Amino acid sequence: MGCMLAVSALGVTACGSDTKSSSGGTVSGDNLTIYSSLPLQGTSKGQSEAVISGEKLALEQAGNKVGKFSIKYVSLDDSTAQNPGTADETQTAQNARKAVQDKSTIAYLGEFNSGGTKVSLPILNKAGIPQISPSNTYVGLTTNKPGSEPGEPTKYYPAKTRTYARVVPADDIQGAALATTMKEDGCKSVHIFNDKTTYGAGLARNVELAAKKVGVTVEGNDGTDKNSANYRSLAAKVKADCFVGSGVTGENYVQVFKDVAAANPAAKLYGPDGVAEAAFTDPKKKGIPANVGAKTKVTVATLGLEEFKKRGNADAQKFFTDYKAKYGTGDPDPYAIYGYETMKLALDTLKAVGDKANDRKAVAAQMVGKTKGRNSVLGTYDIDNNGDTTLTDYGLYTIKNGKLTFSKVIKAQGG
């Protein structure tokens, strides 16, 4: 997902300019460090803590080691008290530079927000540090497909080699999943709001393109301001029979959905993975009211436990069993699964290069383009030469009793 970036969401031209490390590099000794950078304050705190719980579980299962190498885990907060629930530009850059300055760094897991990765990726790429995101979906981080901006993704890779991968499908797939669902639900037209972030605006463009392809008329695509007290005047414009809120909870999207539902009670409501959290779904946690939740569907790039069991995914079953043993619940936030696979991918890549697990260049080269037929908690996938997963299945969720409830698998293909 992806999403927010405080201060200047697109201001990344100077990123890494004061970092003197060159591309690549080998860590001396047998002690390696994996950094995690996520927003640990505000509305994204719950999702980020879920990611961390998955990362820690995977590392614990490995005994905090890969071959002869010991692995240290360091968790960083890319949000601030002034900008909670989002990747703060200055803090994100500091986190990336901290990892660069640590000579034992072998991998960096983050950011949660696509806008944050726009900042950290050039810094880390210049230093040759492999980076894996559990949640970025913005297409421009890896390709110049529709939904990206001019100069992307080249400007994020100053070392001219790929060092970044993600374990979730990009937003051309999520846009298609939302459009496919709307078509199946009988939508004739859709009005889109976007939160103006890298994630929200980019996904909105993908939804527009995908909706037109399946014959759903796009009535509008309007940006929202997170600081607005309400969105009644904007919501009054929504006359379509369906609505997509392309944003994240932290950009005031509980209020957005409430106001649209009040202005157009008959409209079917749809949200992306950016609102797939209790802070949005649960009224007890200041989420949307139950009557709004009853007509809202959410797309998430992971599937329900029963679907995993039906497919006979042994990796998924082990994850849920071990997660319950460690944390006391067999029903974790979906982002715990992403966090788990992010760490597993990092560790398995280190294992694959053997004695070169301390060689950043070797690790990055193995991860991007050589990850083939990987059996994982998410299913079997490759990481292509751009750093994208070949997984395309999306889960469709409804909201019941304030919780996301798996409904079905969406089969969709991006453009």
Where do the protein language model's features map onto the residues?
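Segments of small-molecule ligand-sensing domains
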Residues: 322-337, 347-406
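C-terminal motif of bacterial Sec signal peptides marking the signal peptidase cleavage site
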Residues: 9-14
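Bacterial signal peptide processing site
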Residues: 16-19
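Beta-alpha junction/loop-to-helix N-cap segments that form part of ligand/metal-binding clefts
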Residues: 22, 46-50, 65-151, 223-229, ...
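Extracellular/periplasmic periplasmic-binding protein-like sensory domains
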Residues: 259-339, 404-406, 410-412
